Every structure is written in C-alpha cells, then in structure tokens.
Regions:
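Alpha-helical transmembrane segments and their cytosolic interface
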Residues: 1-29, 150-201
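Hydrophobic transmembrane alpha-helices
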Residues: 2-65
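Internal alpha-helical transmembrane segments of multi-pass membrane proteins
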Residues: 22, 114-137, 188-201
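Hydrophobic alpha-helical transmembrane segments
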Residues: 22-26, 58, 69-77, 95-100, ...
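Structural signal for membrane-spanning alpha-helices in multi-pass inner-membrane proteins
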Residues: 32, 36, 64, 83, ...
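Interfacial aromatic-anchored transmembrane helix boundaries in multi-pass membrane proteins
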Residues: 35-51, 77-112, 153-156
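Membrane-interfacial segments
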Residues: 39-44, 86, 90, 112, ...
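Mid-bilayer segments of alpha-helical transmembrane spans in multi-pass integral membrane proteins
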Residues: 103, 107, 111, 130-145
Length: 201
C-alpha cells in the first residue's frame, strides 16, 4: 500500500504522522504523564498481588483506537516507564514485565477497532477498550507467572480486578470516541465512520 503524504490526517495508519496525530499524541502523552507523575493513574487495592489497579492503560487504548498504533504505543510506553520507575512490587522492577505488555495495549486496541468499526463504531470502541485492557492484564500476569513472581494458583483471585479495569476502559473509550467523532463531524449525534474517516485508518 502506498504511503504518500496525507491531508488533514487521522488515526489508524501504521506509519507516518499527520498534524492532527502529532497534536493528539501530545495530548494523550500529556495525560499519561500527568496520571503517572501524580500517581492518580495507579489505584491502591487491598491485596496488591500484581501492584495497584490502574487507569494508565486508558490513554493507550484511546490513542490507539483514535489515532493509530504508533500513538497508542507511545502512550503505552509512558505507562510502562512509570510502572518501572515507581515500582511498588518486585514484579514491575523487571522492565520486561513493566514495559512490554504496555507497548502492545494501543496496538491491540487499534487492530480491534479497525476490524470492527465497519459494523459499529460503538462496538469497535467497547471491544478496543476490553481487548486493550486485557492485553495489559494478561501480559503482566502471564509474564509474572512465567518469571516466578506470581504463583499460578493465585491468578483466579485477580479476575475481579482484571474485569473492573476492562469495563472501565470500555466505558471511557466509547465515550471519548463518540465525543471525538461528534466534534470532527459537527453533528449532534455520533456518526458512523465516514468514507473519508475510513481512509484515515
């Protein structure tokens, strides 16, 4: 597929940034930095077997769904770096566990979103939120078990936290995506992705 210059810009192209993508990447990155630096993105839980609960994955999910895998990857990188630098569990002192799954959050969210948006933008948004969040949770837990930080027997006790994070990501993603599409279209009801918007992916 030819990757020539694009006008206006938009999410979804795996390579090359439009002006809009640069702006959105800056905003998403700023939000991720704020959540990480203030620790507002990390929510203490009574039994932190795999560290705190988090909303840090949400900027990566939204960035990936709206503006493509590179924006999502950058937001995920910020999430991973903060997890590593401020590790409150030995699990996240391992950079592979702290960073690698987070790099994939936005990429998976993007892939799911572009795969489902032809059926429904709302469905695509919810699925991107869920699968992006599960990429983080399953990746972290899987690597923690693999490296011996977490006994396999305790994994079922983590399911409520995993579900809560996935539901939150789904809700926020659909709200943000609908809002952004409304702003872009100038309508009062959220449109489906237009043919012009399709080309941006």
């Amino acid at each position: 597929m030819a990757m020539g210059p694009r006008e206006g810009g938009g999410g979804g192209s795996a390579f090359g940034f439009s002006t809009r993508q640069v702006v959105v990447a800056g905003i998403i990155g700023g939000i991720a930095l704020f959540l990480g630096a203030t620790r507002l993105g990390f929510i203490p839980v009574p039994i932190p077997l795999i560290g705190n609960a988090t909303i840090m994955h949400i900027p990566a999910v939204v960035g990936g769904a709206l503006e493509g895998p590179v924006v999502g990857l950058l937001a995920g990188l910020i999430f991973g770096v903060f997890s590593f630098l401020y590790a409150e569990s030995p699990i996240f002192a391992n950079p592979l566990i702290a960073i690698l799954p987070r790099l994939l959050i936005g990429v998976v969210a993007w892939a799911v979103f572009i795969g489902l948006r032809r059926f429904s933008v709302d469905l695509a948004s919810v699925a991107a939120g869920v699968f992006g969040s599960l990429t983080n949770s399953v990746g972290v837990v899987g690597l923690a078990v693999l490296f011996g930080f977490l006994p396999l027997a305790v994994v079922p006790t983590l399911i409520p936290q995993v579900i809560a994070e996935a539901v939150l990501a789904a809700v926020v993603t659909i709200v943000v995506v609908r809002g952004v599409l409304l702003v872009r279209s100038g309508r009062t009801t959220a449109p489906e992705v237009s043919s012009d918007e399709e080309r941006r992916y």
